[in-house]
Each structure stands twice: as C-alpha cells, then as structure tokens.
C-alpha cells in the first residue's frame, strides 16, 4: 500500500468521524443548559426561583429556567439535572405548587439515531480492518487471501536488458530465443516449432539467475509476472493451490505473457511420505502447479521461467519436458566471463590507469557475478572513504581481500611472538607450494588479520580448470600441511592456527579415496551414498553402504595421504630453511608480499619430483607412448598464432547450408514460372484430391519418379470447361514427358529403367 493510498484512507476516516461528531453535536438540544446537582435544582424549586420547567420523562432529566441566576448556578438562568426513577410526579407536584409553568416531554427514539449509534463504530472498525489488511498486502488476512500475490512489472519500472548481463552467454542465448519467439513468431511457426512452455534456471547463488529473468522482462515486450515460491504456501489450508490457479488465470487473461517464479524449490520440492505427521499442503500446491503447467487445461502463450539453487530436490514430474522444456545451467563465469562482468560493473565508474581488470579477472577464480559486482562496489566505497576520485589497483586488491576474508582487524593487538608464528606459518604454506610441480603459483601472502584468519596465502591458477589430476590434489595437500610443518620445524610444537588447513586437507584426502577412486588399495569405487528423504534435505539421511573393515581401510588411506603430504612439506622446509627464514623476515617487515617479491626470494628453490607412492595401478602398467598433441600445441611449435577462432557447431553449418539450398531451389522454381511448390501458379484445383495434390516423394535421388505416377490424363475424371489438372511437386528431369501428356505407360517404364539407379 503506497503513501498516496494511506493518505487517502486516513482522510476518508477523518471525514466520517467529523460528520458523526457534527451530527451528535447539532442534534443535542440541551446546549445552553448548565448541568447542576439534583440538590441544587430542588433548592431552586423550594426557593420559588423557577420560572418554567420541562420534565423529559424518557431521559429522566429536568430542565429549569430560573427567574434569576445565583451563586449555586454560577449565574446561569438555565440549568439541567437528572432525577431518580419514579420521582417525576413529585417534581411535577412541587413545581405546580410554586405556580411554575411545567411541561412534560416523552421523546420517541429515532431509528436513524439508533442506527448511527451502533453502525458508525462498526463502520469505523471495518474501515480500520480493511486499511491494515491492505497495508499488509491484502493476502495474509482479510478478504482475498486465496488471490495470487504475483506482481506485474509496469513500463515505469527501471528496465534490465541483456546488455546488462555478462558471463553467462549460453543462458542469454537460450533466453534470447524465447524473447525473439514472442516478438517474431512467424519465423519459428514456419518450421512448425513450438515455444518452450517452461525454462528452469539453476546454479549456485549469485550467478545471475534472477538478473536473467529481469533481462527477459525488460526485453520481452509482453506482460511479465513475478512471484516467489514462498508466496504460495502460508498458514491457511488450500491457499497455495488457490493462488496457483489464480496466477495462471491472471496470466491467461494477459496472454502472451511470462511468469517468473523465484526459488521454486520452496513449492516444487520432491513429494514424499509426509514424515512428521504434517499436512500435505505443499504437495497439494505442487500438484496444482503440475496441472496448470501441463494438464487438460489450455495455457497457450504462457511461458513459465523458474530459478532455483537446488535442482536436485525438485520433483521429477516438475522437470519433465512439457513443463520445463529447457533446463539452463547458470554456473560461475570463466575467465572471459569474469572480464565481461567486471567491464559491465565498472562502466560509469572512474578507473585509474593501474586498475587492471584483466589481471583482476585472473585472480578471482571461482567468484560469481555477484561477488565480482561486490568487489567493484567495495573498491568504490573504499575510494570514497579515503576521499579519492578514481578507483585504483590497490583499492581493487583490498576489495578482493575484503570480499574473500572480510574486513581487516585493525584494532586487534597481536604480540610479537604470535606475529612471528603467523609469519612462519604462512611462509611454510608459500614455500611448500612454490616447490611443488603441480600447483598454481602463489600470487600473494600476507600476515594481516582478516575475519577469522590471522593471515593467508593466495594461489591463483593461470587458467580455468574443470579437471584435477591426482598429482595436483596431492600438491594441494602439501600446500595445506606446509603451515603445520613450519610450526613444528621452527617452534617444536604445533598451534591451533592450522585447524582450517587440517580440515581442508582431510576433505581433499577423503574425496580422493571415497569419491574419485584414486586409491589403488580400495579401487575405483565410490563409497557412501545418500539415501535421505527429500524432506530431510537428502544429505541428513546419508548412510554408509560399506563394511566396518572398508571404513577402517578408508581411514587408513586418508591418514596415509595426509602423512605423506605432511612429510613432503617437512622435507621441503628443512631443505630450504634459510629461504623460509628470509621469507618470514620479509613478512614481518612488509606484512604483505606479491609475486615479483616472492620470485626474487625463491630464486634458488627448485621444483620437487612428484610423489609416486600412490601411482600404483594394481598390475595395470601404463603405456610409455605419449599422448598426441593438440592443434594448439602443434601451432605453437610451428610458431603460428593461437588460439584460432572457435568454429561454429556442425549443426549450425548444416542448417545454414540446407537453408541456402532451399532458397536457391525456390528461386529457380520462381524463374521457371512455378509456384512455391513447383507448380504453375493458380492451377491447384479441388478435383485433384482424388489422386492427391502432390507428387509422392520416397526419398529417392533427384530426377527419379515413381512408375506410373502421375496417372494418365485419360484415366482422370473430366470436367467440362476445365483444363486438365496439374500436380505440383518435385520438378521433373529435363526431357521427361509432361505428366499430363498422352505418353504411354510403357514409354514411362522405359524412362524409369534408364533413370533408376541399380540396387544390389
């Protein structure tokens, strides 16, 4: 409820209250009479100071007009008082004895007055009730709680277009097709294509699913309704199904249109057995949604777009084609996507010359579009805090650290000993990673406290990777255990600072053994599967599907991996202890070191050989033959530029080639005087239906026709005054007799024998 409606409602209530008060004020005929005690009135009567009197029997009140005002009446000559029940006759007799003029009035109650007394307060209460109901949305309480709470975007709202979306080109392409279908349906309908009924956007939080929906709303040019999945189900039973029906009814009235349901997992969760004894309100709502999306009812022109972070818990009936024809993954952007996202969010912001967005894109692997937008915004806020005018490279660097680790803890007082331990701990991580051959190089190491960490070392990959080898994962274990190894080597005892490192190492080692099958002892087997009920979040119901002996072997393999990585880190730090001391000293002095400074410190550090203790293939001997080289590697060897432009998919080239061929055929047919189907224009007749209106095409080579087809003109029914019918279809070869001629069937058979290819 906006401010204008609130002001209007309050004004209406004030007017009603003012009118009611005016009615009661001006209808009161006792105005001008001074209320006095009953004893004062009796004193005036006994003192013969009453000129006239009026007894209101129904109201049990006495009005006196005095001959002269006095102190008891405060000088007023008109007084009014109440008298007890049954004393009207005594008052009349007393006034008559004093020769005062007495009149008795018995008022009859006004029906209008009675109604106003009871109805006006009721109207006020109803008005307040309606006002508060509308202020709370009108759907939670009061009337219309079963109505849909979907909001239709108006033209006045700020529009988001596909130009504002970056990093998810595949999703944009899929959604742009829907927008193009709504605006140019003829191109698709000519091919018999049908518009998708539903599109599901799924992916991690912050990847731009809702932003894509807003872009579709800004460019579709059709009514766009948006609603959250949690808006369907509330405290009233049956409200969810009612709102689903009302939503689609509203959409059908505005067809063609688009409905966007955000967080559809709130209502589309997989149906279960109703654990806990609760009602099936959610299932009832889901069933109604399934029927509305693809049931007996017609929903032509209504496209449903939904977004979720958990596609794995959605009901299978909701995901089938016909309901959600397209399921579009919206994942974290790659390097090119991050560059595009940073360019979009930095547009309109003053950037300094040292603000390297390409380098920033390389250092933000794994960040979503929302994270990158937050980085740019944090850099702008930091610049404004320091009264700067342009966003610099250091501001972007600080913004990345704030987004990853939180703000710097400036007020924390750290002792020299703790600072020294932190320097050696982070130095151990950095040196161990630098000496391993299969790990991303360290970009930055710092001992500045942020959030819950006392320092961190950042390893930035050179390029995006979708796969990790066993050697890379072992190198990650060595990197994680480098801090604990440095503590034990230098200070002869561990600290609690390695808790997150141990947790991360355990997670990596256990996944290598139980998920990725990298242990030769346990084999390529996945151990442990989820058997949980969807209403328990699935993961809460995980049960082991292996024996206790296998569980013990898993623990042994995990411990073996971590111990090997721990030992490798220890040996690296022992060999390069002087380098570790130099690195720790630089960290204590500068607090933060970057790649160029680390390269000068680690100039003498050589890469270690790979750990081979887990390279056993169980009797399977790998081949010594190297793999083939990729076209890119061959181009680099030849000194050619690479990468080359990515070719279009094969199906696109095939479609383009077929389209060009069809257009060429149509143009040739038009030049020879034939219509769209290869027949003379205007020769199609209803009488042709006896034999079929087109020449049959059995998929044979061009120039071949069926024996005896079309029938001879002498066998066709004749129509007076009408020319012989023609049969549109595939053009006949040059020199072939016209189907409408009198050529004998034998001659046609000879022609077929000459043109038909031999089979055998």
UniProtKB/Swiss-Prot annotation:
InterPro entries: AAA+_ATPase, AAA_lid_3, ATPase_AAA_core, ATPase_AAA_CS, FtsH, P-loop_NTPase, Pept_M41_FtsH_extracell, Peptidase_M41
Lineage summary: Bacteria, Bacillati, Actinomycetota, Actinomycetes, Mycobacteriales
UniProt superkingdom: Bacteria
Disordered: region residues: 616-760
Function: Acts as a processive, ATP-dependent zinc metallopeptidase for both cytoplasmic and membrane proteins. Plays a role in the quality control of integral membrane proteins.
Pfam family, one: AAA_lid_3
The protein's required cofactors: Zn(2+)
Keyword Transmembrane helix on entry: yes
Localisation per UniProt entry: Cell membrane
Biased composition regions of type Acidic residues, renumbered to the chain: 740-750
Record-listed ATP binding positions: 203-210
Keyword list, A-Z: ATP-binding, Cell membrane, Hydrolase, Membrane, Metal-binding, Metalloprotease, Nucleotide-binding, Protease, Transmembrane, Transmembrane helix, Zinc
PANTHER family in the record: ATP-DEPENDENT ZINC METALLOPROTEASE YME1L1 (PTHR23076:SF97), METALLOPROTEASE M41 FTSH (PTHR23076)
Bilayer topology term: Multi-pass membrane protein
Molecular-function GO term, any one: metalloendopeptidase activity
Name assigned to this protein: ATP-dependent zinc metalloprotease FtsH
Major localization listed first in the record, in broad terms: membrane
Name of the encoding gene: ftsH
Enzyme Commission code: 3.4.24.-
Cytoplasmic-side segments: 1-5, 132-760
ATP-binding recorded as keyword: yes
Ranges of biased composition (kind: Low complexity): 650-669
Extracellular topology ranges: 27-110
NCBIfam families tied to this protein: FtsH_fam
Example GO biological process: proteolysis
Protein family membership: In the central section; belongs to the AAA ATPase family. In the C-terminal section; belongs to the peptidase M41 family.
Subunit structure: Homohexamer.
């Amino acid at each position: 409820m906006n401010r204008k409606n609130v002001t209007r409602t309050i004004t209406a209530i004030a007017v009603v209250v003012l009118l009611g008060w005016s009615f009661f004020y001006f209808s009161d005929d006792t105005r001008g009479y001074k209320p006095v005690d009953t004893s004062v009135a009796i004193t005036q009567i006994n003192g013969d100071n009453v000129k006239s009197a009026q007894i209101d029997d129904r109201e049990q009140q006495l009005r006196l007009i005095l001959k002269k005002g006095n102190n008891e009446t405060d000088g007023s000559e008109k007084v009014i008082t109440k008298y007890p029940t049954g004393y009207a006759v005594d008052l009349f007799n007393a006034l008559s004895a004093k020769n005062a003029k007495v009149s008795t009035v018995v008022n009859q109650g006004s029906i209008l007055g009675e109604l106003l007394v009871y109805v006006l307060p009721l109207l006020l209460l109803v008005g307040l009730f309606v006002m508060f109901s509308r202020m709370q949305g009108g759907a939670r309480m009061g009337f219309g709680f079963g109505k849909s709470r979907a909001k239709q975007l108006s033209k006045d709202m700020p529009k988001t277009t596909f130009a504002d979306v970056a990093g998810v080109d595949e999703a944009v392409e899929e959604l742009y097709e829907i927008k193009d279908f709504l605006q140019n349906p003829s191109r698709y309908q000519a091919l018999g294509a049908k518009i998708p009924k539903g599109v599901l956007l799924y992916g991690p939080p912050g990847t731009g699913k809702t932003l894509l929906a807003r872009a579709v709303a800004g460019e579709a040019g059709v009514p766009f309704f948006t609603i959250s999945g949690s808006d369907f189900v509330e405290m009233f039973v049956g409200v969810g199904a009612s709102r689903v029906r009302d939503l689609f009814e509203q959409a059908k009235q505005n067809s063609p249109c688009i409905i966007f349901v955000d967080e559809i997992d709130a209502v589309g969760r997989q149906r279960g057995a109703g654990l806990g004894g609760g009602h099936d309100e959610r299932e009832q709502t889901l069933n109604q949604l399934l029927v509305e999306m693809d049931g007996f009812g017609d929903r032509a022109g209504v496209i449903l777009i939904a977004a979720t972070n958990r596609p794995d818990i959605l009901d299978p009936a909701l995901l089938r084609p016909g309901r959600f024809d397209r399921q579009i993954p919206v994942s974290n952007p790659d390097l090119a996507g991050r560059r595009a996202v940073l360019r979009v969010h930095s547009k309109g912001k003053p950037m300094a010359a040292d603000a390297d967005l390409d380098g920033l894109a390389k250092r933000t692997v794994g960040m979503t579009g929302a994270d990158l937008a937050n980085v740019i915004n944090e850099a702008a806020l930091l610049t404004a805090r320091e009264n700067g005018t342009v966003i610099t490279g250091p501001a972007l660097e600080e913004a990345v650290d704030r987004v990853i680790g939180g703000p710097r803890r400036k007020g924390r007082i750290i002792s020299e000993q703790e600072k020294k331990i932190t320097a050696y701990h982070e130095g151990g991580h950095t040196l161990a990673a630098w000496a391993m051959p299969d790990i991303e190089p360290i970009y930055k190491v710092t001992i500045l406290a942020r959030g819950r960490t006392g320092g961190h070392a950042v390893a930035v990959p050179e390029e995006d990777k979708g796969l990790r080898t066993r050697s890379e994962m072992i190198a990650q274990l060595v990197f994680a255990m480098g801090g604990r190894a440095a503590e034990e080597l230098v200070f002869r005892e561990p600290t609690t600072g390695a808790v997150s490192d141990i947790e991360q190492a355990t997670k990596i080692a256990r996944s290598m053994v139980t998920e990725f099958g990298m242990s030769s002892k346990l084999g390529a087997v996945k151990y442990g599967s989820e058997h949980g009920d969807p209403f328990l979040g699935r993961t809460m119901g995980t049960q082991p599907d292996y024996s206790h002996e296998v569980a013990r072997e898993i623990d042994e393999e995990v411990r073996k991996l971590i111990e090997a990585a721990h030992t490798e880190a220890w040996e690296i730090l022992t060999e390069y202890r002087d380098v570790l001391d130099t690195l720790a000293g630089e960290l204590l002095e500068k607090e933060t070191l970057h790649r160029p400074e680390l390269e000068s410190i680690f100039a003498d550090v050589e890469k270690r050989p790979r750990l081979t203790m887990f390279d056993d293939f169980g009797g399977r001997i790998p081949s010594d033959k190297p793999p083939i080289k990729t076209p890119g590697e061959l181009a680099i060897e030849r000194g050619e530029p690479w990468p080359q432009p990515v070719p279009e998919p094969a199906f696109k080239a095939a479609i383009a080639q077929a389209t060009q061929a069809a257009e060429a055929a149509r143009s040739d047919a038009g030049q020879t005087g034939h219509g769209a189907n290869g027949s003379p224009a205007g020769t199609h007749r209803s009488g042709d239906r006896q034999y079929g209106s087109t020449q049959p095409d059995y998929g044979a080579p061009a120039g071949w026709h069926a024996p005896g087809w079309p029938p001879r003109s002498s066998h066709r029914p004749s129509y007076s005054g009408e020319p012989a019918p023609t049969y549109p279809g595939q053009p006949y070869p040059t020199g072939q007799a016209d189907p409408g001629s009198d050529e004998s069937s034998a001659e046609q058979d000879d022609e077929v024998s000459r043109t038909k290819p031999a089979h055998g």
